[in-house]
Amino acid sequence: MDSDTCTVPDHFLPRKLSKQNLDRFIPNRSAMDFDFANYALTQGRKRNVDEITSASRKAYMTQLAVVMNQNRTRILAFRNKPKALLSSNHSDSPHQNPKSVKPRRYIPQNSERVLDAPGLMDDFYLNLLDWGSANVLAIALGDTVYLWDASSGSTSELVTIDEDKGPVTSINWTQDGLDLAVGLDNSEVQLWDFVSNRQVRTLIGGHESRVGSLAWNNHILTTGGMDGKIVNNDVRIRSSIVGTYLGHTEEVCGLKWSESGKKLASGGNYNVVHIWDHRSVASSKPTRQWLHRFEEHTAAVRALAWCPFQATLLATGGGVGDGKIKFWNTHTGACLNSVETGSQVCSLLWSQRERELLSSHGFTQNQLTLWKYPSMSKMAELNGHTSRVLFMAQSPNGCTVASAAGDENLRLWNVFGEPPKTTKKAASKNYLELFSHVNSLR
């Protein structure tokens, strides 16, 4: 071996790197707080020293530690939910419960069922749909009245009127839902017992032309005719006519007794609404002594609805050329509010549980509109009908609404929410599956 030459072991030679200009890795510790880390470690080694500390001071120190040492925990560490700090706002006392905010109710935009209703008359002055308290829905199609028992899901034909007497121009259930009054084009009114499916009696002599509106008040059946007369019939006695109201000069197209039975609202073709006193029901002579006369509408008034939570409040809706919903104090006669809807108001229904009002309309949208009362802000618009929605009826539980229109369709809407939990199961069968086995009313 040459003395001037030295062999260097391979492990002392520098490694051949694939990349050049590399340096050692120096981590960035700017986000690391070594002072706090040292404090946290050393504090844990200190012996606990017993000292007298008040409860308030302990609470203060705990909250101060939370504030000063926030975000100094391990990432994704499992720990208990942090305690809420006391608010600095003295009005938010721990003894006061925060005001609960009621969640907004979901309102389905589509109808639950759609049925064909061939022969349904497209006449603004008639009343051809009613849902009784016995859970039976009645609808008049031409000369025939059909019934749907929602409790059993069965359908039946109640009566077909002779051609010389028909068509049927109005229907209305008694308050117990066991008997149905049927107004006819020839001025007669028939009373039918749907349980036995037989006619009980016929009322004649009260009108000179068709009977387009009916309203029950216990044993009194009030009828409104094209002749402008409103007739009170006591169905318990042979000579049933016990009183007549005179105030409308044209057809009476809307009648509604208040829930207490003390006041009657009537709407007519001559843009007038009258409020009548029940004490003048039985009068030996026709009376023109109404309590109030409202003339603010500019079109026929068919839509009438007494408020269920305020006995003296009445909502009315005007037809084509008016399109307004008005609210009246029937004690003072004052108009409380007037809302422009933009289209013919055909029918009105109050919610039985919420402060809400449902209206049905004509051209251009033929929609149902749900309003929040008293702000009258729109909660929902329900579309589906292609012609004016003339008739609406509410189920006994107050949740489902049936609507019938000039397009010869009957639709069911779950617009007023779910039924109470105690009846939810039964209601689901009774209302949502009411027409599951039929597609047509005939």
Swiss-Prot record:
<dbReference type="GO" id="GO:0005737">
    <property type="term" value="C:cytoplasm"/>
</dbReference>
<feature type="region of interest" description="Disordered">
    <location>
        <begin position="85"/>
        <end position="104"/>
    </location>
</feature>
<dbReference type="GO" id="GO:0051301">
    <property type="term" value="P:cell division"/>
</dbReference>
<feature type="repeat" description="WD 7">
    <location>
        <begin position="384"/>
        <end position="423"/>
    </location>
</feature>
<comment type="similarity">
    <text>Belongs to the WD repeat CDC20/Fizzy family.</text>
</comment>
<keyword id="KW-0132">Cell division</keyword>
<feature type="repeat" description="WD 4">
    <location>
        <begin position="247"/>
        <end position="286"/>
    </location>
</feature>
<feature type="repeat" description="WD 6">
    <location>
        <begin position="340"/>
        <end position="381"/>
    </location>
</feature>
<keyword id="KW-0131">Cell cycle</keyword>
<dbReference type="GO" id="GO:0016567">
    <property type="term" value="P:protein ubiquitination"/>
</dbReference>
<dbReference type="GO" id="GO:0097027">
    <property type="term" value="F:ubiquitin-protein transferase activator activity"/>
</dbReference>
<feature type="repeat" description="WD 5">
    <location>
        <begin position="296"/>
        <end position="338"/>
    </location>
</feature>
<dbReference type="InterPro" id="IPR019775">
    <property type="entry name" value="WD40_repeat_CS"/>
</dbReference>
<keyword id="KW-0853">WD repeat</keyword>
<dbReference type="InterPro" id="IPR056150">
    <property type="entry name" value="WD40_CDC20-Fz"/>
</dbReference>
<feature type="repeat" description="WD 1">
    <location>
        <begin position="121"/>
        <end position="158"/>
    </location>
</feature>
<dbReference type="InterPro" id="IPR001680">
    <property type="entry name" value="WD40_rpt"/>
</dbReference>
<comment type="function">
    <text>Component of the anaphase promoting complex/cyclosome (APC/C), a cell cycle-regulated E3 ubiquitin-protein ligase complex that controls progression through mitosis and the G1 phase of the cell cycle.</text>
</comment>
<dbReference type="InterPro" id="IPR033010">
    <property type="entry name" value="Cdc20/Fizzy"/>
</dbReference>
<dbReference type="InterPro" id="IPR015943">
    <property type="entry name" value="WD40/YVTN_repeat-like_dom_sf"/>
</dbReference>
<dbReference type="GO" id="GO:0010997">
    <property type="term" value="F:anaphase-promoting complex binding"/>
</dbReference>
<keyword id="KW-0833">Ubl conjugation pathway</keyword>
<feature type="repeat" description="WD 3">
    <location>
        <begin position="206"/>
        <end position="243"/>
    </location>
</feature>
<dbReference type="Pfam" id="PF24807">
    <property type="entry name" value="WD40_CDC20-Fz"/>
</dbReference>
<comment type="subunit">
    <text>The APC/C is composed of at least 11 subunits that stay tightly associated throughout the cell cycle.</text>
</comment>
<comment type="pathway">
    <text>Protein modification; protein ubiquitination.</text>
</comment>
<protein>
    <recommendedName>
        <fullName>Cell division cycle 20.3, cofactor of APC complex</fullName>
    </recommendedName>
</protein>
<dbReference type="InterPro" id="IPR036322">
    <property type="entry name" value="WD40_repeat_dom_sf"/>
</dbReference>
<keyword id="KW-0677">Repeat</keyword>
<feature type="repeat" description="WD 2">
    <location>
        <begin position="163"/>
        <end position="202"/>
    </location>
</feature>
<keyword id="KW-0963">Cytoplasm</keyword>
<keyword id="KW-0498">Mitosis</keyword>
<feature type="compositionally biased region" description="Polar residues">
    <location>
        <begin position="86"/>
        <end position="99"/>
    </location>
</feature>
